[in-house]
Regions:
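A beta-strand signature from Gram-negative outer-membrane beta-barrel systems
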Residues: 116, 125-169, 209, 718-719, ...
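Transmembrane beta-strands of outer-membrane beta-barrel pores
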Residues: 139, 159, 170-174, 191-193, ...
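N-terminal plug
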Residues: 36-44, 51-101, 116-125, 140-147, ...
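C-terminal beta-signal and adjacent terminal beta-strands/loops
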Residues: 630-632, 705-708, 712, 716-734, ...
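Surface-exposed, low-complexity loop segments enriched in small/polar and acidic residues
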Residues: 109, 208, 215-223, 255-289, ...
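Short strand-turn segments of transmembrane beta-barrel domains in outer membranes
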Residues: 134, 152, 161-188, 277-287
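Short loop/turn motifs that connect adjacent beta-strands in outer-membrane beta-barrel proteins
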Residues: 160-163, 190-193, 302-307, 374-380, ...
Length: 903
C-alpha cells in the first residue's frame, strides 16, 4: 500500500469551488479557522491498491485552475516583518507587480477569494491576522470582472483574532536637513460573524531646503540679495568714470554690501564681480507636510451565505513649499541723488521682505465603500459601491508689488541702496486654485458555473457597473478667474468565460495535458466620449502539474482621465530645469493643469507566460513572460524638453529674445503611437533554516510556494488548530507558534526585465523617439534596457533581515548635436532598502526583565542603504547644475527606527 501525499496536494486544484462551499464556510468577511478535521481528506482505494488522498483548497482560496505565482503561509508572512497589509504588499512587489507595462497601479485585492470595495478595507489589518496570501497572474482578474492588466492578491484571514497595536516611527537622512515622525494605532477584531478594523495615523515631516544640500545655484541671473548693477550704456557699460577707476570696461558690478550711499570708488572694488545670487535657503527640495488619516472597516454576516461590509476613510494633508524670494529689476536714473554713475543703470535684486514666495496646499479626502456578497445557488453575486470626494485648495504667492517702489526710484525719492530699501513691500494678490473631484461607482458581478463539460466546469462572470465622475475647479490668477466643471457618466458591461478543453484525468488530456481557453468582451459608454470597447482571449496549457503555459491578447479603448482634461491651471515659478538646446541649467516658470483637447487611446497587448515548479527543488518556482504593447493616441504627461520634444511641441515653449528658456507648458499631451516589447523572468525560492518543523509545529510552516491552490494545508496532522489558538499573533503565543517561537525561514524573489523595444511617435512626419537609444521623455532620461527587482530575507529566532531593491541600467538623452547643445548620460542605479527587525517576544530574557516589551517589535529600516543616486554627466563629463544629486534624490540614505507594540 502506497500513500502519495504529493499527489494529494496537487489534487487540491480540482476541489470544490470556493464560491460553492457549504453555508458555514463563507458566513463572514473572515475565514473560519480550520482544524485538521475540518479539511476533508477522503481516502479512496483505487484499483491498484494505492491510497489516494484528495486534498481540498483552503477555505477562502480563489476558485481557479490557474496556479498562483506565489503563496505565502504564516511563517512566510512573519518573516517579512510587515506591520500592515500595505507593508506586506510592498514586500512582495516583485511577485505582485505586472510586467504588462501599463503603469504601476496596485494589484487587484481579494478577501477570502471574494471582491471587496477596495484595498482600503484591508490595508491596515495586521499581518498576524492573515493565514495565507495567494498571488495570481493577470488572467485571474477576468474571473472577478476586472481587466487582465494587474495581478491578483488574495488574503485569507484567520478567525477569532483580536489585537490592538501602536507604532511610532522616526526617520531622518544621513545628511540631515529634515525629519519625519509617524504615529499609528490599530484596533482589529475578527469574530465568528463580524470583522472590525480601525486605524489612525498622524505623520509630520519638516521641510528640506536647497541650502541644506549645498547645491550650486544656476548662473545667468543678475538677481541677488543686495543687488547687482548692469549697464545700459554703449556696449553695456555702467559708467565711463567707473571703467577708468577699474582699469577696464565695467558692465556688471555687485552693490557694495552694508553701504547706503556707495561711491564710484567703492563700486570699482566690485567691478565685473557679482553678488551671490544663491537663495537656496528660500527654496525647498521637500515641502513641510502634515497628514492625519482615519480608516475604519466593519463587516457582518447577514445570513449563512450573505456578508455586508462597510468602509470609511478620511485624510487631511497639508504642505508648504518655498519657491524663492521676491525679485525684480529697477532702472536707476542717472539724475537720482543716490546714484554715483551719472547715467541710467539697472539694479537687479532679491528682497527678504515680506517673506519667501510660498505654495500652500490643503487636501481633504473622504471615501466610503461597501461590499455585499451573496450566494445564489451556485452563483456568487457581489455588489460593490464606492464614493470618493477629494477637495484641494492651493495658494501660490506671486511676486511682490513693486509699482510704488519702482516709481520712487525713477523719481529719485527712494534710495535703492539703503538698508531699508523695500522693507515695506507687500505681495501681489496670490494665485488661487481649488478643485473638488467626486467619484461614485457601483458595480455588480455574478460568477458561477453554468454547465459542466467532461473536462471540467465552465466558469463565467457577468459584470455591470455605473460610474459618475465630477470635477469642479476654479483658478484665480492676475485678477482673471477661470472655472471648469466637468461631468462624466460611465455605463459598462462585460462578460468573461473560461472553458476547459481537456482534463488531466479525462480522455486525451492524460496524454496532452490540460487545455483551457478564456475570453472576455465588454464595452463602456462614456457620456463625454461615446462607446469604448474592450476584449481579450487567452489559452492555457498545463502539460504537467508543475508546468503551465499561457498566451493571451487583450485590447481596449481608453479615455483620458477627467482630471487630465480639467485640472486647474497652475504656474509654478523658479523650477530648476535643464535646457538641452543651450546646455545650461536655470530656473523657469512651469505651467501644469488639464488639457481639454486630449483624445481617446486604443491599446492592444500580447502576453506569453510560462510557470514551472520543478519537483526536484522544494519551494522553488520559475516564471517567464513576454509582453508586447501597442498604443495609439496615448495620453501622457509632458515629456522631458529635449530638442526632439521641443521641435514637436514648439508652442509649449517660451524663450526670450536671446533664446533663453523662460517657461514650459507641461499640461498633458497625446502621442500618436507607442510600441514596446519586453521579457520578464524571475524566480521565487524559500526554505526553512535548520531542521524541518516537526508535527504539531507552527501552522502552515510547510506551505508550498508557487504550486497549485490549496497546496498549503492548514496545519500538520496532530498539530494545533490552523489560524486558531485565540488572540495574538496567531497560534498560542504572541509572535507565532505555541511558546512564542516562529519557524526560521528564508526567501528570495528575483526578477529581471529586458526591454527589447521602447518607441514613441509623437505625430506623423516627425522622427520616432527610441527611448533605448538616446531619446527621452522624462527627466530621468530614456528607458533602461535592464531592470532587476530583488526581495529577500531571513527570519531566525526572532531576528529578521530583509533586502529589497531595484537595479536599472544607464540611459542617455541626446542633444541637437549643434554647438552649445549637450548629450546627457544617466548612470546605472541600484536602489536598495534594508530592514532589520527583532521580535522581542522571542527574547525571553529581555521580556522577563521588561515585561512591557511583550508583544513588541523594533525595526531599523535603511532606505537607499548604498546611497546610490543617478550620476548625470554631459558629453564633457560635467554635471549640469539642474542634475545635481541633491535635486535628483534630496533624501539620500535615510534611517528609520520604529517601535511596534501589540496589546
Amino acid at each position: 500500500m502506497k500513500l502519495s501525499s504529493f499527489s494529494a496536494l496537487l489534487l487540491a486544484s480540482t476541489a470544490v469551488p470556493a464560491m460553492a462551499l457549504d453555508d458555514e464556510v463563507q458566513s463572514t468577511g473572515s475565514t473560519v479557522a480550520i482544524s485538521n478535521d475540518e479539511i476533508e481528506e477522503p481516502v479512496e482505494d483505487d484499483s491498484s491498491g494505492e491510497i489516494v488522498v484528495t486534498a481540498q483548497r483552503i477555505r477562502g482560496s480563489v476558485d481557479t485552475d490557474v496556479p498562483p505565482v506565489e503563496e505565502l503561509n504564516e511563517a512566510d508572512i512573519a518573516s517579512l516583518g510587515a506591520s500592515s497589509l500595505t507593508d506586506l504588499v510592498a514586500a512582495v512587489a516583485p511577485q505582485a507587480n505586472s510586467g504588462r507595462g501599463r503603469g504601476g497601479g496596485q494589484p487587484i485585492v481579494l478577501l477570502n477569494g471574494q471582491r471587496i470595495s477596495g484595498f482600503r478595507e484591508l490595508r491596515d489589518l495586521p499581518p498576524e491576522a492573515i493565514r495565507q496570501v495567494q498571488i495570481f497572474p493577470e488572467e485571474v482578474a477576468l474571473k472577478y470582472g476586472f481587466r487582465p492588466d494587474q495581478r491578483v492578491i488574495n488574503f485569507i484571514l484567520k478567525d477569532n483574532f483580536a489585537s490592538f497595536s501602536t507604532e511610532f516611527e522616526h526617520a531622518q537622512p544621513e545628511d540631515g536637513g529634515f525629519a519625519t515622525n509617524e504615529f499609528e494605532a490599530t484596533l482589529t477584531r475578527i469574530g465568528a460573524s463580524t470583522r472590525f478594523n480601525l486605524d489612525v495615523e498622524l505623520e509630520r515631516s519638516t521641510a528640506l531646503t536647497e541650502s541644506e544640500r549645498d547645491l550650486i545655484s544656476s548662473g545667468g541671473s543678475l538677481l541677488a540679495r543686495g543687488g547687482n548693477i548692469s549697464g545700459l550704456g554703449t556696449n553695456g557699460e555702467i559708467s565711463p568714470a567707473l571703467s577708468v577707476l577699474a582699469g577696464s570696461n565695467v558692465t556688471e558690478a555687485g552693490v557694495p554690501l552694508g553701504i547706503s550711499n556707495p561711491s564710484l570708488l567703492q563700486f570699482a572694488g566690485t567691478a565685473n564681480r557679482l553678488n551671490d545670487g544663491d537663495i537656496g535657503d528660500a527654496r525647498t527640495l521637500l515641502p513641510k507636510t502634515e497628514r492625519l488619516e482615519v480608516n475604519g472597516t466593519w463587516s457582518r454576516s447577514l445570513g449563512p451565505q450573505t456578508v455586508l461590509s462597510l468602509n470609511a476613510n478620511y485624510a487631511l494633508t497639508g504642505s508648504e513649499s518655498l519657491l524663492g524670494l521676491p525679485g525684480t529689476s529697477f532702472v536707476v536714473p542717472g539724475t537720482s541723488p543716490f546714484s554715483p554713475f551719472g547715467q541710467d543703470v539697472t539694479l537687479s535684486r532679491y528682497f527678504d521682505t515680506p517673506r519667501p514666495l510660498e505654495r500652500e496646499s490643503e487636501t481633504h479626502v473622504f471615501q466610503t465603500g461597501s461590499t455585499f456578497n451573496h450566494l445564489l445557488g451556485g452563483w456568487r453575486w457581489t455588489v460593490t459601491g464606492n464614493y470618493a470626494r477629494t477637495a484641494n485648495d492651493t495658494r501660490t504667492t506671486r511676486n511682490a508689488d513693486f509699482m510704488a517702489l519702482r516709481a520712487g526710484v525713477l523719481a529719485g525719492t527712494i534710495n535703492s541702496f539703503a538698508a531699508d530699501f523695500g522693507a515695506n513691500l507687500l505681495f501681489q494678490a496670490p494665485d488661487l486654485a481649488s478643485s473638488v473631484n467626486q467619484n461614485i461607482d457601483v458595480r455588480s458581478t455574478l460568477a458561477g458555473t453554468p454547465l459542466t463539460l467532461p473536462a471540467g466546469d465552465v466558469q463565467m462572470t457577468f459584470a455591470s457597473g455605473f460610474t459618475r465622475q465630477m470635477l469642479d475647479s476654479e483658478t484665480w490668477r492676475s485678477g482673471v478667474t477661470t472655472d471648469v466643471s466637468l461631468r462624466r457618466n460611465i455605463l459598462n458591461h462585460s462578460v468573461n468565460a473560461e472553458l476547459p478543453l481537456t482534463g488531466r484525468d479525462f480522455g486525451i488530456g492524460s496524454t496532452i495535458g490540460e487545455w483551457s481557453v478564456n475570453g472576455n468582451i465588454g464595452y463602456s459608454d462614456l457620456s463625454d466620449f461615446g462607446k469604448l470597447l474592450e476584449y481579450g482571449a487567452g489559452l492555457r496549457w498545463a502539460p504537467a502539474r508543475n508546468l503551465t503555459f499561457q498566451a493571451s491578447i487583450t485590447g481596449d479603448e481608453n479615455a483620458p482621465a477627467i482630471g487630465q482634461l480639467g485640472n486647474p491651471t497652475l504656474v509654478t515659478p523658479n523650477v530648476a530645469t535643464y535646457d538641452f538646446t543651450r546646455g545650461e541649467s536655470l530656473f523657469i516658470n512651469v505651467v501644469t493643469g488639464g488639457n481639454p483637447a486630449l483624445i481617446g487611446e486604443k491599446r492592444r497587448d500580447v502576453i506569453l507566460n510560462a510557470n514551472w515548479s520543478p519537483d526536484f527543488i522544494k519551494d522553488f518556482a520559475l516564471q517567464f513572460s513576454y509582453f508586447k504593447n501597442n498604443s495609439r493616441n496615448t495620453t501622457s504627461s509632458f515629456p522631458l524638453l529635449t530638442p526632439e520634444i521641443e521641435a514637436a511641441f514648439a508652442s509649449r515653449v517660451v524663450r526670450d529674445v536671446d533664446g533663453r528658456l523662460v517657461s514650459i507648458d507641461q499640461r498633458p499631451v497625446n502621442f500618436d503611437r507607442e510600441t514596446s516589447q519586453r521579457i520578464r523572468w524571475g524566480l521565487n525560492v524559500s526554505g526553512n533554516i535548520g531542521a524541518e518543523t516537526p508535527a504539531g509545529g507552527p501552522p502552515g510552516a510547510t506551505g508550498a510556494r508557487g504550486g497549485p491552490p490549496g497546496a498549503a494545508a492548514g496545519g500538520s496532522p496532530g498539530g494545533p488548530r490552523a489560524g486558531g489558538g485565540g488572540r495574538g499573533f496567531g497560534g498560542g503565543g504572541r509572535f507565532g507558534a505555541p511558546g512564542g517561537g516562529q519557524p526560521s525561514r528564508w526567501n528570495i524573489a528575483l526578477y529581471h526585465t529586458y526591454r527589447i523595444q521602447e518607441e514613441i511617435l509623437i505625430r506623423p512626419g516627425v522622427p520616432v523617439l527610441d527611448l533605448l537609444n538616446g531619446s527621452a521623455t522624462s527627466s530621468n532620461g530614456g528607458a533602461s534596457r535592464h531592470e532587476v527587482e530583488l526581495s529577500g530575507g531571513m527570519f531566525h529566532k526572532g531576528f529578521g533581515l530583509r533586502l529589497q531593491g531595484t537595479y536599472k541600467s544607464g540611459t542617455t538623452a541626446n542633444g541637437t548635436g549643434l554647438p552649445g547643445s549637450n548629450d546627457l548620460r544617466f548612470s546605472d542605479i541600484a536602489a536598495v532598502n534594508a530592514f532589520l527587525f527583532v521580535n522581542l517576544d522571542q527574547q525571553a530574557k529581555v521580556v522577563k526583565a521588561v515585561p512591557f516589551l511583550k508583544g513588541s517589535r523594533v525595526t531599523l529600516r535603511v532606505e537607499n542603504i548604498l546611497n546610490d543616486i543617478v550620476d548625470v554627466r554631459d558629453q564633457n563629463g560635467n554635471v549640469p547644475l539642474g542634475y545635481q544629486q541633491g535635486y535628483i534624490d534630496p533624501r539620500g540614505r535615510v534611517f528609520e527606527l520604529s517601535f511596534r507594540k501589540r496589546f
